[in-house]
Amino acid sequence: MKYVSTRGGEDEVSFTSVLLNGLAKDGGLYVPKTFPKFSTKDLKKLSHMNYAELCYQVTKGFISESDIPHKDYKKICYKTYDKNFGENIINIDKLSENENILNLFHGPTLAFKDFALQLLGNIYDYVLKKKRIELTILGATSGDTGSAAIYGCSRSKKIKTFILFPHGKVSETQRKQMTTFKNKNVFCIAIKGDFDDCQKLVKDFFNYEEKKINLAAVNSINWVRIMGQLVYYFWSYFKVEKNLRSVSYVVPTGNFGNVYAGYISKKMGLPINKLVVSSNKNDILTRFFETGVMKLKQTIKTVSPSMDIQVSSNFERLLYDYSKSTKLIKNLYRELG
C-alpha cells in the first residue's frame, strides 16, 4: 500500500513514512492510493470476529508486509484491545426499533479517541524499536485527544509527547487528565487562543524545514488515527444489523475525522446509507453542506469543546476524494487561509 498527498507535492510514500511524519511535506494530508474492498461474503465472515481480530482484518490492507509483517501487526491489534478497554469494549443502547446510541467511552481515558490512539501508540512503539530511533510527538487538542494521546504513547520509552491545548477552553476533567499525568516524557502546554490556533502551530512545526528532530502527529491529520477509527463502524454495524441492510450514522463532528472514518468504511463496502454531520454553534460544516460555502467565523466556546473548531482538517481528505485534483485542494486551502 502506498500513500499520496492531497496537495500533490510529494511522491508516493510508505505506511511507515505516513506514520512517522503525519503531515505531508507540502502541507497536505496523506491518503491511501487505493482502499481495501469487502464483498458481502467477506462481511459475513467479519461479523463473527472479536474486536481485536476485526481490527486486524479491516486495517491490515493499509499496511504492507515490508512495513509491518502481518503476523506482528496481528499481535499489536490483540495487545491494544485488551484489559485497557474492559470486558465490554463497546456497548450499544437501544432507543427504539431503529435507533441506537453507540457508546465509545470504555477506553482508559473515557474518550472515543482511545480506540485509535491506543493502536497508534502500540504501532509507534513497534516501529521505533525496529528502527532503533526516538520520536517527538506533537499534538493539538480541545480536550480528549490530549489525554488519549498521552495515555496511548507514554508507555514507549522512545517517545516524548508535547500536547498544545487552548487555555481555559477544555473541560476541567480533561485538563487534569493531561496536566497531572506523571511521566517525564510528557509535556502539556496551554496556548492563549482556541483549538484552531493550536492546530495551526502544530502544522507550522511540521512545515518548518530546518527541524532537527523526528516529529510525528497524533491528531487525526495522521492517517493512522483514521485507520483505527474504521473498526468501530464495522463492529457497531454488525451488532445492530444481521441481514446486511444499510444503516445510517449521526456523528458529532469537529475535525471531521470520525465521520470521515465512516465515509471510508462505506467506500470499503460497509452498507452505510447516510452519514449525518452533527454540530454545535461552531457550525462551519453544517453551513457548508447546507449552502456550499465554507467561511470562517470566530470560534464560540461551548460545553462540547471538542467541536469548537472552524478549520476541520480532515475535510480536505473528503474534497480530494471527490475531486482527485491536488491543484483544486491547494487553491481552496490557500483561499481559506
How should each PLM-predicted stretch be described?
Residues 1-337:
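PLP-dependent amino-acid enzyme catalytic core
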